[in-house]
Structure formats: C-alpha cells, structure tokens
Amino acid sequence: SIRYGNLDILEDGYGINMLPLATYAMETYKDDPCTVFGIKGVSDYHSLEQELGRKMHKAIAVIQFKVEGQIIKRHPGYKMDDRILLEAVDYNRGVVTIEGTEYPMLDTMFPTIDPKHPLRLTKEEDELLHTLIMSFRHSGLLHKHIRFLYTNGALYKCHNGNLLYHGCIPMRPDGSFEGMICNGEELTGRALMDYIGEQIHKAYFLSEDDPDKNSARDFMWYLWCGAKSPVFGKDKMTTFEHYFVADKTTHRERLNPYYKLSQQEEVCDRILQEFGLSGEGSHIINGHVPVKIKDGEMPVKANGKLFVIDGGLSKAY
C-alpha cells in the first residue's frame, strides 16, 4: 500500500493506524532521504508527504526482508536460501552478491541492521511489528472481507464444465506438472491445488495455540512469492533487486513454463482432464494474466480452450 500510495485504504477503509510506523520511520531515518523508496503513481503528494512516505516505505521494507529471511530459515524445504539477500550484503563495502556476482548497492544506510545478525529485528522494530499486527487483527471490516473471501472463494473452481483459477498450474518445460514436496509426498496438478486450499484454510481458521497454524501462515507467504506457487507463477520475486541494484538484469522474473505451454490446445486439454473435465464445451478461465493488446495479443488462446482475464483494472498495470 505504501509503495503505490494507497495508505488511505488501510487507514480510512480498515481503520488501521499508521501513526506508529510514521513516527518510527521519521525517527529512525531522519537523516536518510530514502530516495530509492519513492512512491509509485503519485504526483499530487506534497513534498513533505512524499518524504514521509519514502521513510515509511524503507522502514517497513527492511522489516519485511528481515522477517522473510526468518521464514525461509524455518523452512529449508522452500529452497529459497538464495533469497535471503540481507545476508548476501557486504555492509562495509556497500555491495550485494546475487547468483555469484557482486553489485554496488543504491542505498547503503541501514541503521537497524547488525551485519553479524542481519535478520534480527531491533527492539523498536519488534515493538512496531507487534503494534501493526494488533491493528490488523482488530480491524472488524478487514475480517469481514476476509471471511467473505473464504466463504465464497477458492483456489480453483469447476463450473459448467469450465475450470477457473488465478495464476497457473505449475508445469515443467516438458509439459508435465511441476511437483511440490508436501509432508514428505510430491504433489502435482489438482492434488497440489487441493493441498494448498487446505493450508489456506488452516492459516485463518485454526486456533492460535495450534502449532499447525504458524506453519500454514508461513506457507501463505510462500504462495505469494515461492517458485512453485500457482498464484505467483515466477521463479523469484525481485523486490530487493528493484530497490537496491541498478543492473536491470537482476530484476528479471522468469515465468513458469505454464504460460507458454498453455497456449497449446493439447496442454489445455490435459489440464482440464486433470480436473475431471473434457469435451468441446470445457474451457480454462485464467485470471491475473496481463494481456498486451497493444502488442497484438488476444485474450482467447489455444484454439478457444483458454480465456485469459487481464489484470488491467489495477493502477500498477
């Protein structure tokens, strides 16, 4: 929300108090212009508002990278150690090593990072995070909307012979379904989607004292940015690189092979069969896939088997 200037949604819409973050950011980064943390798509902010926004943006981003690193450490099975980039920084020299190559960093001011323990939250960061968590947990309207999504939504839906889903069905380059190890068993296709659906519900509905709840919550984070997540569909999320590295080759996020393969009718038929659907009247309705109309791309693909719904209503697109 901060990155795209949408704090009004949190503050006015859901009643979540951003003052603790603003106060912390102004104090912690008072001598830091935070220039690489500009607010996207916002031109009507007063200069002081933009400065505060940049400081808040950096403050929560640093906390994000620390907490994400901790999640990855807890789950070696995610195979995301290469994304713990705070540990790949040489804080004395101001460089970060990514996939074996050193890059100079665009920002080297990290007053809250201990180079010996870069993932450790400071006392102030920990208190701020706890305060923000409590604000989110006690927002009645937010939970009303979340419950609506859980009641009416699903990871996929079969309806009138059609298959609807968001993102992709993870695939390998040879067209076979990409697997994920879940509780010691490799799951693919529909079995993987069903398992993910179960974890999504556990993350919200299990009681706070159930040890499976925290694991499911961590898995929800993996779904947002993990390489084998059907709702992400890329090899990595390069947020860190966008902030700190000028070399745009590090910004690239490679799409899952699904996105090319699904343009073939026979691949779509195989996906439909995986979900118990077949015949001329069956189609895939695929959400969250931008359609580049200006480049001549069409939303109907695979000889009419695949309908792609663009994310064009988003300001970011």
Language-model-derived ranges and their functions:
Residues S1-Y317:
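Feature recognizes metal-dependent phosphohydrolase scaffolds
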